[in-house]
Regions:
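Bateman/CBS regulatory modules and CBS-like beta-alpha motifs in cytosolic regions of diverse proteins
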Residues: 1-26, 37-39, 43-46, 57-85, ...
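Short hydrophobic beta-strand motif reused across regulatory alpha/beta modules
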Residues: 33, 45-52, 104-112
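Short acidic/polar active-site loop segments enriched in Thr and Asp
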Residues: 33, 92, 153
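Regulatory loop-to-helix N-cap segments in sensory/regulatory domains
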Residues: 54-56, 116
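Cytosolic regulatory modules rich in charged/polar residues
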Residues: 71, 99, 103-111, 115-218
Length: 218
């Protein structure tokens, strides 16, 4: 999933000779943390809402260029790259440039989150399991083999943390018995930190047990 599928042009970036008040109008209207600043076709940087609020409303935006933050994203970057840049720059907007450094539009964090929410990892039903293993032992192929040995199908996995000398992995999978998968991981030296699943059979047995209890109460 690439950035170029989510480029927006909902507003035109202000010109560098326009006043700070105009930049703030755009920021407030679209709920932005930053606004991109250009001098002609040359990208200068991103001015934060706080920088504009501290400046005089009649100052020209170009006068604030020394306070601009230099972050952009390429049109061929992935949405995961975008998430990292949003986080690193405490921003909800990323200017998108092509390989010639020309401005194509911008990327909004809400659009990226919406895009990621359509991934099979999110949409497909399944169990969520967080496992932990030493960094030396971490192997995607071994994790896949353990899951497959229990007739489980992995929908997706990713590394979520590095506590001390360990690696923590979040897995989403489809399995007949999540308990069997969990036990096998533990036999191979993994720690199962967390697991969540919805078991229809378990729900059925629970309902029948509750009905029996009600009958016995009568």
């Amino acid at each position: 999933m690439l950035v170029n599928n989510y480029i927006s042009k909902d507003f035109i970036p202000p010109k560098s000779n326009q006043p700070v008040s105009h930049g703030l109008e755009i920021i407030n209207e679209f709920g932005l943390t930053h606004i991109p600043l250009f001098e002609g076709l040359h990208f200068i940087g991103n001015l934060s809402k706080e920088t504009l609020e501290e400046a005089g409303p009649d100052e020209k935006l170009l006068q604030l260029k020394d306070f601009a933050d230099d972050f952009t994203i390429s049109e061929n970057s992935s949405l995961l790259d975008a998430i990292q840049k949003f986080n690193n720059n405490a921003s909800n907007i990323l200017p998108v440039l092509n390989t010639e450094k020309q401005y194509l539009g911008f990327l909004m964090m809400d659009d990226v989150i919406s895009g990621l929410s359509t991934m099979p990892f999110i949409l497909e039903p399944g169990a969520i399991m967080v496992i932990e293993v030493s960094q030396k032992q971490f192997s995607i192929s071994e994790i896949a083999k353990i899951a497959e040995s229990n007739n489980a199908r992995i929908i997706g996995l990713f590394v979520t943390d590095y506590p001390e000398d360990k690696t923590q992995i979040t897995i989403k999978l489809i399995a007949e018995s999540i308990a069997s998968v969990s036990e096998t991981f533990e036999r191979f030296g993994y720690t199962v930190v967390y697991k969540f699943f919805h078991d229809e059979k378990e729900d059925l047995y629970k309902d029948r047990f509750e009905q029996l209890m009600k009958y016995l109460d009568v």
